[in-house]
Amino acid sequence: MRDGREYLREVVEPPAWRDDIAAFSILDQYEIPDGYVFGWQFRAPVIEMPLYMPWLRSRVESLGGTLRQSFVEDLSEVPGEVVVNCVGLGARELCQDDEVRPARGQVIFLDQDPGIGHFDQQPETLTYTIPRSDVTVLGGTAQVDDWGMDIRPEENELILDKVEALWPELDRSKIIGGTVGLRPSRSE
């Protein structure tokens, strides 16, 4: 469980999930960074995919499940009583779903713990710090229809500038890497 703060540029109703988590409170004005007018603090689980996915695979196999990675041209080719379709962007071809589009995400890895996560989830200013057990993930970008997989230095600068607005204690000398990934998205 980790604490996080989400900052907003307008006052809104608290989210429906507020009663479903361990802790939730509205921030006092002095806790809100410049440029924002409202926000909340919460305690919620953080799932670290590099740790969770191997555990999940092991769990499925220990319960008698099998995992198979292969090239599939049609879902009817796949045997099994239950098939979990995890093709992501591959749904464009496999499922003839032209609405699935890439959303390019670039993040930075930092060897500095902010203590809590910081979030601005608005699409035009998407910003986050996600503390994990080994690094803090800084983000981000969500560039729809961008298939580019190279790390772009100008995007790193944008991410760092946005994060510093939420977390002024950021130490740029603690950057240890970064990555780019493509998430499936759709316009609906």
What spans do the regions from the language model cover?
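A conserved short coil-to-beta-strand element within the FAD-binding core of flavoproteins
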Residues: 65-79
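A short, glycine/Asx- and small/polar-enriched loop/turn
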Residues: 16, 78-81, 185-188
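Short FAD-binding loop at a beta-strand-to-alpha-helix junction that anchors the flavin cofactor
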Residues: 130-142
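Flavin (FAD/FMN) cofactor-binding and adjacent substrate-gating region
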Residues: 1-60, 186
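Central helical "cap/lid" subdomain
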Residues: 76, 80-122, 143, 149-156, ...
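Small-molecule pocket liners
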Residues: 5, 104-108, 127, 136
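Flavin (FAD/FMN) cofactor-binding core of flavoprotein oxidoreductases
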Residues: 3-13, 160-188
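FAD-binding beta-loop-beta segment adjacent to the flavin cofactor pocket
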Residues: 19-29, 112-127, 131, 172-188
